Amino acid sequence: MPLELTQSRVQKIWVPVDHRPSLPRSCGPKLTNSPTVIVMVGLPARGKTYISKKLTRYLNWIGVPTKVFNVGEYRREAVKQYSSYNFFRPDNEEAMKVRKQCALAALRDVKSYLAKEGGQIAVFDATNTTRERRHMILHFAKENDFKAFFIESVCDDPTVVASNIMEVKISSPDYKDCNSAEAMDDFMKRISCYEASYQPLDPDKCDRDLSLIKVIDVGRRFLVNRVQDHIQSRIVYYLMNIHVQPRTIYLCRHGENEHNLQGRIGGDSGLSSRGKKFASALSKFVEEQNLKDLRVWTSQLKSTIQTAEALRLPYEQWKALNEIDAGVCEELTYEEIRDTYPEEYALREQDKYYYRYPTGESYQDLVQRLEPVIMELERQENVLVICHQAVLRCLLAYFLDKSAEEMPYLKCPLHTVLKLTPVAYGCRVESIYLNVESVCTHRERSEDAKKGPNPLMRRNSVTPLASPEPTKKPRINSFEEHVASTSAALPSCLPPEVPTQLPGQNMKGSRSSADSSRKH
């Protein structure tokens, strides 16, 4: 018998009046969007953590709740001080026990995140260089009805490896009290410890049944095997588009337009007199940057095109960069919306990211529309994007790893250029005001604003929702409790009790924490 449906007031989508019973967990892997464990593979300093963080940022941005579980963080939590590369020697049995238990502790948290906390994808960031370790992870995934997808980063270029070590590794907590030369020497010896037992993925023989992608020489070549579903295909597509070449991305809004002056949203009005001054100032700014082969992108709306015309440079128009569609509220002021559509006004104040204008769009829709723009931005070198407030917020949220709840309230003032420079594990942003006055179109978060739908409702949703959950500190409270709880699933990997410090070590260094609007 057909279910009775009702339309949700916020997202304007049809949902059953009564919640349907959840599917049994045994059906999990058959679902298109069932939980997935991404397993990183590769020697140290091959960019695994870079890929993990960047991929996680992308997946969260498109609305797939994702979290990284870095086993190195668990190791630093279990062993408070690091001595030397001897910790990673294959004949150091005490250290091997610690490392295996840290991996198990991370898998425990992976299970909790995917099964209880509404997560969709967990990135297991470790070397995972042996088939024995990868078999353990596959067994764990099968026992918990998770899919597994392997990403191996392979690089034999000594220049790239040395660059990775200098840029990232020597600044890690492990080498807090070492100079650069000492850190480099120790880390190279650490790599040698892994090389002795490294068993690369072999899709032609041993690993022909695994879903995997091998990223070779920082994206020069790729090898893909047995992609299982839509999400895995998107991961492959994303990894094939990113690069690590130095570049700068400039983001700005169009110059002030007539609707900005009137407080109206949407529409397609031209620049005001101050908006034209900004366009001239932007042209001068671009000349001063002296950028080689700068690409300029605009929307198909009048104000961005007028702004770009002042640059006297070729530019490309993207329909995807058009401002968010306000539907029946287009070209109204917020006061007019409040008076004409009081319920819609209140709903949007409560839930700005998920709220969809009648016959219009939501921020969630806008993110989906902008995904091709992000893909192309990742492929490019120097780019200037001239767009609109809601669009700029979405792009900025991607590069700065902002949550769905933060996105609609990011401050993106008129007549200001945001200069983005990709760095090791993130993006550095510089705000440059071009000294041309304008109206302020930013609206602060309402006190009535609330979080979106329950994250546990995402898994069987057609459009997964972004995760509002913050990154949690690794939890290594009781290895004994963890071993007992995983004994059935991992019978061959049961290590004994974990020491907090290895016998006979005189360790140095300590762990430190790292880390790295108007319209709508």
From Swiss-Prot:
The active site is at D125, C155, H254, E323. The record marks R253, N260, H388 as: Transition state stabilizer. Gene3D superfamilies: P-loop containing nucleotide triphosphate hydrolases, Phosphoglycerate mutase-like. Phosphorylation by AMPK stimulates activity. GO terms for biological process: apoptotic process; fructose 2,6-bisphosphate metabolic process; fructose metabolic process; glial cell differentiation; glycolytic process; motor behavior. PROSITE patterns: PG_MUTASE. Beta-D-fructose 2,6-bisphosphate binds at R253, N260, G266, Y334, R348, K352, Y363, Q389, R393. Its EC number is 2.7.1.105, 3.1.3.46. GO terms for cellular component: cytosol; nucleoplasm. ATP binds at residues 42-50, 164-169, 345-348, 389-393, 425. It catalyses: beta-D-fructose 2,6-bisphosphate + H2O = beta-D-fructose 6-phosphate + phosphate; beta-D-fructose 6-phosphate + ATP = beta-D-fructose 2,6-bisphosphate + ADP + H(+). Residues 502-520 have a biased composition (Polar residues). In the C-terminal section; belongs to the phosphoglycerate mutase family. Homodimer. Forms a heterodimer with PFKFB2. This is 6-phosphofructo-2-kinase/fructose-2,6-bisphosphatase 3. It comes from Homo sapiens (Human). The gene is PFKFB3.
